[in-house]
Curated annotation (Swiss-Prot):
Signal peptide: none annotated. Its EC number is 6.1.1.16. A motif ('HIGH' region) lies at residues 32-42. This is Cysteine--tRNA ligase. InterPro entries: Cys-tRNA-ligase (IPR015803), Cys-tRNA-synt_Ia_DALR (IPR015273), Cys-tRNA/MSH_ligase (IPR024909), Rossmann-like_a/b/a_fold (IPR014729), tRNA-synt_1_cat_dom (IPR032678), tRNAsynth_Ia_anticodon-bd (IPR009080). It is found in: Cytoplasm. It comes from Herminiimonas arsenicoxydans. Binds 1 zinc ion per subunit. GO terms for biological process: cysteinyl-tRNA aminoacylation. PANTHER family: CYSTEINE--TRNA LIGASE, CYTOPLASMIC, CYSTEINYL-TRNA SYNTHETASE. Its cofactor is Zn(2+). Monomer.
Amino acid sequence: MSALKIYNTLAREKQLFTPIDPGKVRMYVCGMTVYDYCHIGHARVMVVFDLVQRWLRASGFDVTYVRNITDIDDKIIKRAAENGETISQLTQRFIDAMDEDAAALGVQKPDHEPRATNYVPQMLGLIDMLERNGLAYKAADGDVNYSVRDFAGYGKLSGKSLDDLRAGERVDVNTGKHDPLDFVLWKSSKENEPEEVKWSSKWGSGRPGWHIECSAMACELLGEQFDIHGGGADLQFPHHENEIAQSEGASGHTFVNYWMHNGFVRVDNEKMSKSLGNFFTIREVLEKFDAEVVRFFILRAHYRSQLNYSDAHLDDARNALTRMYTALKDVAPDHLPLDMTEAHAVRFIDAMNDDFNTPLAIAVLFELANEINREKSPVLARQLIGLAGIVGLLQRPAQQFLHAGLAGADEMETLIIGQIAARADAKKAKNFAEADRIRAALLEKGIILEDKPGGLTEWRRA
């Protein structure tokens, strides 16, 4: 059976995955900054790395999965002030909303979900170590900065040289930075900032910079070196580059062995932004589409590829998922455990072990669905449900999915049942024109009728 290979951003190639400790995986993913509702870009990060940890566990690894919460940030401070609420009130509200969104999408809770504000002592200890190693300095404005020029490996993740990076930077003469690429480790307090965001330190009152938060939380919960670090492609530079500089600058050795980055989400082939009016929260999307459809839509694309969001693509995902559930509607699975040596399962495993190739893995699921349609095999139904369950799909009764997503579902079901009865009466009276009219009228409402042996008629969404 195949071995897992992961595309390592740092190496720029797929590599055989070998954990530091045999049989155990330590993984960290950059989570949300909680000042607003999560958008579909966040949904992709959640689902992609949920998939990764699910597959690692299914492969027999003992996984420790950490996904942080950034609950202190300039945007958070600004939004709380605008709303007239405390930082903690704002962040808790959006943490609760994030948890609801994640649960709807079938995203399992990480083993640890550290909040940055609970790890300030660890951040201060890391900054102190960097200062002792000659990599941090206090600037004239009171901030403590990281000295990029003094870390030899800077740029190795992004593949950019210091000269190339500096060419794109503007120097602010008032910052006191030694180099325009230097970044803040500790931000000195400003008079107008609330006391909630001020901590004491040997450098004066202040709060941590964004990059130091992840380094400190990751090292505290997973150790100074761990297996996998993930996040969106937008975090590769500067955030992850700066994490490497901080963590390796403090410890003197490798921080992370495998760096994983999921691709961008675009909307109708354009960059998602509020200014373009194409910015959608998870909640807005879930008002129109079933949560499992959204998860399926995300998994149909390879995690490293660009994902293009549109209503048409979500409709297509819904139709595809409907085909799989329809295959299971009339075939109950047997009660034996999933057979990972069966031919479809082997191909599924090979796809997932090839850098989490979900498009190929889902193609295997469709092969199973097609064979179930032909053979009505309980064994194949068990295999389809079992394999799909590994990636968080097809875990509802088929009829529940096929009847879901209808506005006023209870009233609609009553109406449909009544129309099916009226159609049956019309057919008995040999009024086939009326029977056809009822079928066509329901189809216009997105309902497909299927006549079964014995005079039974079932329905499903189109």
